[in-house]
Amino acid sequence: MPRKHLIASQTNKKQQSNAKQLQKLAKRIAAAVKKGGSNIDANPQLKVAVELALAHGLSADSIKRNIHGSEKDPTKLSEFCYEIFGPNGVGIIVFGLTDNPNRLLSSLNGYIAKLKAQLAKPNSVKINFEEKGIALVKHNNFTQDELIELLISNNINLLDLNEDDDSFEVVVDSPSYFALKDLLVKNSFTIEASELRLIPLLTVELNAEQHTLLNRFLNACEEDDDIQTVVHNAL
């Protein structure tokens, strides 16, 4: 199945407990509500957070309670993005969401030291990534050419389209992501998975020792409540 983008290394989600993941997603929903309000249709960050929460099994009722509770919760949550150069120049981006920025930075500095890495200047790592929207969908009796025609005729900026026996992997630019999903639903496609994701424009090879260091770093980040996601471009 054409999952080369959907399974690209970002966070080691398979190793992360579902409870921990749901806790982080609930925090992400709360931050989105505080920043842009509780109207999902008018708040893109909240829309993405809710999509992810539903995909990870959080019930619609739990999400509604979280949204309503977040409107009344006085806790201030701050978003942070740290860029890092790791072993052999591998680029790493850490997205944090915390009520205690000093705690987050202190913990992250410890993880970076063990990785034998260093903090990078803003955009020195991000420049090597591009945000794209990705959807993995069942064929729904469409040929590849028919799907391409459907997307183009609806002004979807298609970047890539992969196909196997029963599925398409559709890759679009980030501004087209929600329009793509609406179009797929309207045409009765079964969406198996979808997300907005930073895709590396170039990749870096690591040796076994460097991979071990990187995996330890990723595991530490996964266990840290203040860290939401980690993106890297290691093979």
UniProtKB/Swiss-Prot annotation:
Keywords: Cytoplasm, DNA-binding, Transcription, Transcription regulation. It is found in: Cytoplasm. One of its GO terms (biological process) is regulation of DNA-templated transcription. GO terms for molecular function: DNA binding. GO terms for cellular component: cytosol. Its main location: cytoplasm. The keyword Flavoprotein does not apply. NCBIfam families: PRK12378.1 (NF009044), YebC/PmpR family DNA-binding transcriptional regulator (TIGR01033). Belongs to the TACO1 family. This is Probable transcriptional regulatory protein MPN_478.
